[in-house]
Amino acid sequence: VKIWRFVHDELFTSIDVQLLQTITLSPKYFPLILALAQLDAESMVLAVAGTRPTIQIFVSRDTQFQLSATLSGHEGWIRALDFTRETSDPDSDLLLASASQDKYIRLWRFHQGNELPVVSSALNDPALGGLVKSLSNKAHWIESTTSKHSITFEALLLGHEDWIYTASWRHRDGKLQLLSTSEDNSLAFWESDPASGVWVCITRLGEISAQKGSTSATGSAGGFWIGLWSPDGNSVVSLGRTGSWRKWTYSSAEDMWAQQVAITGHVREVRGVTWSRDGSYLLSTSSDQTTRLFSQWRREGHASSWHEFSRPQIHGYDLNCVDAISDTEFVSGADEKLLRVFDEPKGVAEMLSKLCDIKASNTTDLPDAANIPVLGLSNKAIQAVGDEEEVENGEDDEREAVDPASIIRKSALEFTHPPFEDHLARHLLWPETEKLYGHGYEISAVAVSRDGGIVATACRASSVDHAVIRLYDTKEWLEVKPALKAHSLTVTSLQFSPDDKYLLSVGRDRQWVVWERSTEPSMYVLKHANPKGHSRMILNCAWTHFEQPTFLTAGRDKSVKIWQIVESEVHLKGIVTANAAVTAVASSAKVFDGKTWFAFGTETGEIGIATANAEGLDKVTVTTISAKISPAKTINQIVWRPGRTDEQKQQIAVATEDSSVRVYTVADDSA
C-alpha cells in the first residue's frame, strides 16, 4: 500500500504527486479495498482489507501511518470498506462498513474518549438468531497524536444471498443510509430503525437470483459489481457482468424507486461490426459471447441518442465476425466450426419501428420472439403468451425443456423506451434459422455479397486444405462447391466488390487473391493472386467504388496498399504508411468529383481518414482522428454507414479491442 500526497501552489498552476510512505502488509495478502477518513483534527485513519478475513486499521502520526488495530469477524475475503460520520456533526462517532464474500456486512463504531460507547441495541436483533453468541464485542483501542479512540462492533447486516461487492454510505433526507450490491443480482438500502436501533433492509432492487440459476458457488461471476449514489442521493447505479449499467431514481410522488434507461455495452474485445443493409441499425459481435444491436432512439423534442435495442445472440463461444444478409437477417461466426443465421422477430421489428422510426416489413409471419432451451445453444422461435395464460413445459424431451424464467409474456414486448438489461438478457433474442457447416476450425471471416445471395466464409488454418473459402447460397442454404483454394494460412478478411463481380480475400500468408464470378452465378474462380502483397501478414481489405475496380489491403507492415485491376493485370497504385500495424480498412460508397474517402485503423487505436482521387491514387491525403476520442487499443473493424444521402454527413462504425463500439461522423471541411 502506497501513501501519496498532492503538492501544489496556491493557484494550482503546478501540481505534483509525492510518495510519503510504502506500507508492507503483514501477514501478506492482496489488498482489495482501502478507506480513508479524518479521525480527528490532527490524524487520519486508514482501513485496509483484502484476501484475508481481517481489517487492518492504520493511524497517521506525523505523516506516517502505523498499524494500530486488526478487526476480525468476517469469514471470507473483504470486498468493500466505507467510512462516514454518524451525523452531520463533525465530532460525532465514525462508522465503518465492511462487506465480505461471507454474505454479511459488519458495522464498526469509532468512538472518541476513554469510555466505551453504549452497547448497540442492533445486537438484539432477533434475526441474528444463534449468531449472537459468536459475535465478539471486544473493544480495540487506537491513539492519535492528540486523542484516544475505541473501536467496537456495532451491527451485523443479513439479507444478501451471495458475495457482497459494495458498501457505500449516504446521508439522505436527514437519515444515514447504506447502499450494498451483491453477486445475488440485488442492490439493497439499509437504515437503522429509529425505535429499536436495529439495521434493516428498507428497499431491495434488482433481480431474483434464482431465475438466473447462477451463483458464486457454481463458478459464476455475475451479480452487481459496483453500486454508486448520485450526488443528490436520489439516484443509484450499478454495473454487472454483462456490461450494463442499471439506474434507479427515487420518485417522491410514488414513494418508490423506478428503473431508468442507462448505458449498456460490451465487456470484452469487440471483434466484428456491420450495418444493416439500409444503415438503420448496427450489429456488433464480441468475445463476451454476445451479438448486440444498436440504433438511434428518436423522440420529438429530444436529440436522437444511441442505445442497445436487442441482444440477438447470447452464445457459449467467443464471437468473431458478423455481416448483414438483409435488413432483417444476419450471419455470425464464432470459435466453433459452423456459422449461424438469425432472423428478426416480430417483437424487435415492432419496437424498432416505434422507437427508432425503422419501417418494418410484413411482420405477420414472423415469430414473436426467441429463447434458448435449457440444454441448447440455438435460439428457438417462440410465440409470446398472454399475461394470464399458463405455460406447458416440454416434459417428454428435456432438450426442449424451457426455463420458466425465459417464458415471454406479450406485455414484456411492449416498449416506450429502450429496453432495460432484464429484457435484453432474456426477451430480445433473435431466432436462429440456419446453420452453415463445412469448416474444420474456428470461423475467422465472413462476407455477404452485395445482392445478399452468397455468403463467403473462412476459418483458422495452418494448411492449404483448411485455408479454403466456402460459399453458401442464401436461397437454399447449401454450400456451393468446390471450395476456393489458394491460401496456405488463415484468411483474415473477405470482401465482395460493389457489383459482386469479384471476391477479394487476404490472409496471414501475406497473400491477397481476387476471385472472379464465373458464368454460373454462384461460382467464383481464381483471377489474380499476389503471394507477396505485403512484407508481413495482411489483416484486412476493402473495395472502393471507383469505376475502375480498385481495392485496398491493410498489413502488419504498417501500410495500406491501393491496387487497381487494369485489363488482365493488377497494378500497385499507391501506398499509405501508418505509425503502427494497420488492422482495419474500409472505403466509403460515396464518390464525389472523382474522389472518395477510406478509413483505416491501427493496433495502437489510431484512426486515419484518407481522401483518394481516382486519377492520382499515389497522392492520398490523410487526416488522423484526435487521440482524445480515439480507442485505447487495436481497431478490429471499420464499416461505413450505408444509405446516407448527400445532405447527410458520412459515418463510420468502429469495433475495437478496448470493448467499445464507436460511431464517428466524417465531414468534408473543404466543402
Describe each region flagged by the PLM.
Residues 1-6, 55-60, 81, 105-110, ...:
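WD40-repeat beta-propellers
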Residues 20-24, 67-70, 154-156, 212-216, ...:
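A short beta-strand motif characteristic of beta-propeller blades
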Residues 85-89, 161-181, 270-355:
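Repeat-solenoid scaffold signature
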Residues 48-52, 98-104, 110, 181-186, ...:
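Conserved strand-to-loop turn within each blade of WD40 beta-propeller repeats
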Residues 104-106, 111-158, 186, 198-223, ...:
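Terminal intrinsically disordered, low-complexity extensions flanking WD-repeat/beta-propeller proteins
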Residues 41-47, 88-97, 174-179, 188-189, ...:
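Structural hallmark of WD40 beta-propellers
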